[in-house]
Amino acid sequence: MTIVTRFAPSPTGFLHIGGARTALFNWLYARGHGGKFLLRIEDTDRARSTQAAVDAILDGLDWLGLEWDGDPISQFERKDRHAEVAHEMLRRGMAYRCYASPEELEAMKEEQRRQGLPMRYDGRWRDRDPSEAPAGVNPVIRLKAPQEGETVVRDHVQGEVRVQNAQLDDMILLRSDGTPTYLLAVVVDDYDMGVTHVVRGDDHLTNTFRQLQIYAAMGWTPPEYAHVPLIHGPDGAKLSKRHGALGVDAYRDMGYLPETMRNYLLRLGWSHGDDEIISTDQAKAWFNLDDIGRSPSRLDFAKLDNLNGHYIRQSDDARLVSLVVPMVEKRLGRPLTGSEHARLLAAMPGFKPRVKTLVELADGCLFLFALRPLAMDDKAAALLTPEAKAQLGELHALFSGLGDWTGGALEQAVRDFAERTGLKLGKVAQPLRAALTGSTVSPPIFEVAEVLGRTETLERIDDARKAG
């Protein structure tokens, strides 16, 4: 059997972080078993569905590296097929037309409320003769659900979950305007697409009982199910806007790498021993549905930052440059020159061990391209005492005559200078850092000087000596 999974988002907004995890789990399970991962856009709510939201979902999946098989399928475009199945159930006697008016149904609910009964359709048209239908009323089509026994969901995550059929009413399959309901459309689409495993949030678990009844009415074999607990915020409450970023696009804008997000989302609800760093290839080999936890997982932004720092350190320097250049250019308000690209690439080994996001990386390297004289932050300016400026003057002379302009040679020269003058290395290096970067925090300062080059280094030292 070929494993077929699907991701079926509604295009009413961005790709939610919870949806991204659902897509990842489906993708991993399919790829790990040599199967197919399909994408279906559940766009039957025409009032809320937008092309911009579809584009955002596709873009988010593409950025995460979750490629799908074939073209995305529009649920709305399959409405005729959904109606065909509803009418087939009518012919089989597994469904019926209901002519109850909205006023009748509201009165029914009010009476149930008054008696303290569960509010559900009472089956008033289930066995009535269609000849009794009132004139001029467009009926809905309802499933003739079993009234005895139970419906059982056998779930890879939740275990065996049962409901008494007497607790379920006859759901609407086709509305009076001929449009299908969500529950019908999902079943028909999953069946026609050959979906073998449905992996989705556990907020869909109650829908599954009704969907299984549709499968049974049509004589179709249902897929296997895995209902995954939702993601909660750090405080344990259901994830909401107050917890921060909700969309995948926001995490990208905050400077997280796609491989970080894949690893992090994988560990939200699934584990492989104590492993925290799990490559995508390892995830494909190890991931299985039965090891998904049954408790909600919590976002942990500190863990996400640390994980991102790991993947930044592991990344190729040229790739990091390509990712960070647009951010740098936006901050500078101009494009980088070819020589500035080269400078950034040369500086990358010193920068990447010190940051946890691409945003930090972009902000941290701006001093490489700053116009002279550099703007100094308060701590850096405080270091430039008259004594420090005198030291910088001596370093200027020392560096001017240095034959080998490398980080190692610069460091040795400054160490020798500190020893001669009886100063600690930090007493010399920190004012130099302030002069070259405008800050008290930077990559190793001798690497910075090497990347800046002799001319730029000497000019920045000169500016710092003259600073008012």
Swiss-Prot record:
Which reactions are catalysed by this chain?
Answer: tRNA(Glu) + L-glutamate + ATP = L-glutamyl-tRNA(Glu) + AMP + diphosphate
> Which GO molecular function entries does the Swiss-Prot or TrEMBL record give?
ATP binding; glutamate-tRNA ligase activity; tRNA binding; zinc ion binding
Q: Does the keyword Aminoacyl-tRNA synthetase apply?
A: yes
* UniProt-annotated binding residues for ATP: K241
Give a GO biological-process term. glutamyl-tRNA aminoacylation
Q: What class of enzyme is it?
A: ligase
Specify the superkingdom: Bacteria
According to the UniProt entry, where does the motif 'HIGH' region sit in this chain? 9-19
Disulfide connectivity for this sequence is none
Q: Where do the TM regions start and end?
A: none
Q: Its GO CC terms?
A: cytosol
Give the E.C. number(s): 6.1.1.17
Motif 'KMSKS' region at which residues?
238-242
Q: Can you state the subunit structure given in the record?
A: Monomer.
Q: Its family?
A: Belongs to the class-I aminoacyl-tRNA synthetase family. Glutamate--tRNA ligase type 1 subfamily.
Function noted in UniProt: Catalyzes the attachment of glutamate to tRNA(Glu) in a two-step reaction: glutamate is first activated by ATP to form Glu-AMP and then transferred to the acceptor end of tRNA(Glu).
Instruction: Give the matching HAMAP family.
Output: Glu_tRNA_synth_type1
Name it: Glutamate--tRNA ligase 2
Q: Which organism is it from?
A: Rhodospirillum centenum (strain ATCC 51521 / SW)
